[in-house]
């Protein structure tokens, strides 16, 4: 391999032997003064340096990166395991006997309030952990931060598994384990996005969601395997396996390279160079490593010159920080408002209502569909782009909810709810619930994490991802807590509520979510600095790759009515 790539000739600066970088990056990025100079005004032809080609080392590079990112993404498995197991716990006899209340006939049950609290309080812990504990990633590094939050998660599991008959002890354990998972949901996608190459970033961040679905599926299977026991094996064995997952996660962190962006920010340049070299499987002195390192250094220096980011700058900073922060909050909120947890948290109970003799088996079917559908997203997210997947995923879920809710309302109980349900209607609802899961798992499930991991500059990234994730968890709490009450009052009309949310989601994505497929994290920031319209963002080209006929101004204005491009593929 030649030491200098064919694509460029390195230009020396007057002060050092470094490569000339794209010095026209937004000078106003997150500046406290709020000055947002035109991106084009800061560029001259001599300042634009073509991007250096990555080392041509074959598929081995992708294997190395993929293994590292899968280890980090295993944090999603921990989250998914909780989702898959708690849905079965609330229907298991020993769990009901220990933590529930007694009917007059001697049978045990969980009240709607207690069920909602036990299931949903986990989300409140996650919201707090995402905001408070994610800061560990900035203080000590993403890897160390992940190890610490996994330890906190384990403490919560110990409290839960030690519970004998006090539901509030189990409740407290759920809060503490939620703190750990909240930190994981911020730090895992963050580390993956900062390690992965731009051309594979969407796919590799989506591995986090694949791990969530694998955890949900195996959690369902474990519940199915323990449900016939009559003692605490029903729920303590699934909880006990959490220790194995925590140890695997901690062990994996020993082999994962630290985020080069964090290392540069911490002044550990040699370690950052080694991290980039390990991920790209090439020598530390390779020109591509030098180019990537100096690009990151330039970005970090601009952020450092602007000073420490305050929480207020998430909404007042430049470029377009208010728009970006609100987009992160909305995307994460809308991911919950798809209604996925309606099925995953309460799937066992919901399908008891449609007359199934073994609703645990139905949950396993859901888990299989969810897992393999999410695997499909590894192809779709970087093939079709973020915007297309989000919009057409919303359309697919709307169609599924129309059928699911309509059949549930009009055909499930033809002779009244006090009479046997229609088996045909119940089967139809299960089929369209599976179609819904396919639409969700291939689009909104992974891409919500991809979007928030890509769209924030490093200086405020942990804060932005924390507040966006907190919005997700808060909505998760509200949906999880109130679902038993809402379904008790309106039953399957609930599906129409989620359908309306997905109609709104389609239009929100069209107007406010830009396309970031194939862009580096620094290039995403440049795109925001230029003020590109989201529905034209798929045509945006980074400065270093533009031809002479490229018209950047055309992407900032739209002279035709928006409805003409509303259903376009861009």
Swiss-Prot record:
Q: Which family does it belong to?
A: Belongs to the major facilitator superfamily. Sugar transporter (TC 2.A.1.1) family.
Query: What are the subcellular locations of this protein?
Result: Membrane
The entry's protein name is Low-affinity glucose transporter HXT1
Annotated glycosylation sites: 228
Identify the coding gene.
HXT1
Residues on the Extracellular side? Answer: 82-116, 165-174, 223-236, 358-363, 410-431, 491
Q: Where is the composition biased (Basic and acidic residues)?
A: 34-43
**Matches recorded under PROSITE patterns:** MFS (PS50850), SUGAR_TRANSPORT_1 (PS00216), SUGAR_TRANSPORT_2 (PS00217)
Recorded hits in PANTHER family, A to Z, give: GALACTOSE TRANSPORTER-RELATED, PLASTIDIC GLUCOSE TRANSPORTER 4
Among the GO molecular function terms of this UniProt record, one is: D-glucose transmembrane transporter activity
Q: Which organism is it from?
A: Saccharomyces cerevisiae (strain ATCC 204508 / S288c)
Entry superkingdom: Eukaryota
Task: Return the InterPro entries for the record.
Answer: MFS_dom (IPR020846), MFS_sugar_transport-like (IPR005828), MFS_Sugar_Transporters (IPR050360), MFS_trans_sf (IPR036259), Sugar/inositol_transpt (IPR003663), Sugar_transporter_CS (IPR005829)
> Which residues are recorded as modified (Phosphoserine)?
23, 38, 44
Q: Which Pfam families match?
A: Sugar_tr
Q: Which residues lie on this side of the membrane: Cytoplasmic?
A: 1-60, 138-143, 196-201, 258-340, 382-388, 453-469, 513-570
Which key words are in the record?
A: Glycoprotein, Membrane, Phosphoprotein, Repeat, Sugar transport, Transmembrane, Transmembrane helix, Transport
Chain positions covered by the region annotation Disordered: 1-51
What other facts are recorded? Answer: Glucose transport is thought to be mediated by two kinetically distinct systems, a glucose-repressible high-affinity system and a constitutive low-affinity system.
Gene Ontology cellular component terms for the protein in this record: cell periphery; plasma membrane
> Which segments show compositional bias classed as Polar residues?
1-20
């Amino acid at each position: 391999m030649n030491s200098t790539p064919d694509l460029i000739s390195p230009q020396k600066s007057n002060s050092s032997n470094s490569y000339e970088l794209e010095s026209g990056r937004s000078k106003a990025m997150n500046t406290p003064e709020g000055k947002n100079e035109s991106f084009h005004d800061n560029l001259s032809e001599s300042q634009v340096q073509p991007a250096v080609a990555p080392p041509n080392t074959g598929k081995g590079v992708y294997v190395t990166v993929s293994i590292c990112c899968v280890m980090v993404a295993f944090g999603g498995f921990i989250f998914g395991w909780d989702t898959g197991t708690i849905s079965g716990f609330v229907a298991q006899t020993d769990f009901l006997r220990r933590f529930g209340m007694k009917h007059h006939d001697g049978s045990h049950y969980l009240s709607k309030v207690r069920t909602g609290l036990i299931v949903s309080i986990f989300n409140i812990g996650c919201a707090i952990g995402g905001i408070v504990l994610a800061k560990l990633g900035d203080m000590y590094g993403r890897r160390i931060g992940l190890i610490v939050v996994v330890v906190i998660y384990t403490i919560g599991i110990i409290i839960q598994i030690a519970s004998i008959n006090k539901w509030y002890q189990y409740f407290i354990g759920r809060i503490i384990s939620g703190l750990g998972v909240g930190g994981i949901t911020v730090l895992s996608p963050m580390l993956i996005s900062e390690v992965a190459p731009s051309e594979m970033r969407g796919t590799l961040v989506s591995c986090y969601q694949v791990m969530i679905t694998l955890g949900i599926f195996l959690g369902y299977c474990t519940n199915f395997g323990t449900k016939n026991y009559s003692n605490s094996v029903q729920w303590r064995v699934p909880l006990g396996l959490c220790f194995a997952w925590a140890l695997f996660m901690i062990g994996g962190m020993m082999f994962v390279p630290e985020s080069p962006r964090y290392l540069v920010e911490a002044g550990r340049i040699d370690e950052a160079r080694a991290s980039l070299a390990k991920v790209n499987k090439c020598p530390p002195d390779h020109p591509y490593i030098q180019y990537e390192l100096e690009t990151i250094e330039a970005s970090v220096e601009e952020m450092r010159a602007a000073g420490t980011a305050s929480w207020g700058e998430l909404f007042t900073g430049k470029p377009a920080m208010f728009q970006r922060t609100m987009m992160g909050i909305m995307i994460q909120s809308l991911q919950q408002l798809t209604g996925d947890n309606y099925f995953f948290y309460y799937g066992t109970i919901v399908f008891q209502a449609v007359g199934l003799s073994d609703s645990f088996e139905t949950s396993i079917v859901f888990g299989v569909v969810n897992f393999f559908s999410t695997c499909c997203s590894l192809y779709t997210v970087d093939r079709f782009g973020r915007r297309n997947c989000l919009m057409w995923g919303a359309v697919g879920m709307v169609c599924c909810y129309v059928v699911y809710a309509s059949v549930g309302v009009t055909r499930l109980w033809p002779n009244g709810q006090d009479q046997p349900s229609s088996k045909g209607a119940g089967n139809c609802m299960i089929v369209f619930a599976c179609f819904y899961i396919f639409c969700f798992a291939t689009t909104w499930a992974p891409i919500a994490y991809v979007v928030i991991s890509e769209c924030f500059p490093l200086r405020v990234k942990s804060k932005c991802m924390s507040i966006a994730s907190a919005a997700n968890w808060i909505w998760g709490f509200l949906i999880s807590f109130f679902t038993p009450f809402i379904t008790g009052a309106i039953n399957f009309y609930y599906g129409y509520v989620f359908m309306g949310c997905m109609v709104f989601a389609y239009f929100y994505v069209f107007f406010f979510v830009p396309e970031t497929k194939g862009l580096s994290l620094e290039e995403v920031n440049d795109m925001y600095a230029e003020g590109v319209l989201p529905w034209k963002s798929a045509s945006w080209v980074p400065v270093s790759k533009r031809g002479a006929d490229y018209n950047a101004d055309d992407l900032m204005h739209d002279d035709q009515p928006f409805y003409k491009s509303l259903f376009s593929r861009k």
